[in-house]
Amino acid sequence: ILLPTVVDFNKDAADPEKYRYIYGCISKDMGADINFTPDMLATEIRMLNYELGILPTLSDIGVTSDKFEQMADDAMKSGNIQCNPQFTMKNDILKLYEQAF
């Protein structure tokens, strides 16, 4: 659910070739002459989620916005934030949750 939103958040800081490679692995439309943009990866992930039956929003799976603070605190404690291509603060994570809500 969060991955397309996170891809959008990271698109300016991430390695575009990594995004292009991932897009090529999951897209049915990847061609040699494609003019790839990182937005295409986020769109493709959303389509893949749909095909797999993954609901599109946090609210669809029963997450309520009053949980965002604790979720963001937990995310900041995980080791994943340090690996993120875009510098990320708790407020950024809260915005991502709101976008995915």
Task: Please give the residue ranges for each predicted region.
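Gly/Pro-rich interdomain helix-loop hinge
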Residues: 1-67
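Short, amphipathic C-terminal "tail helix"
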Residues: 64-101
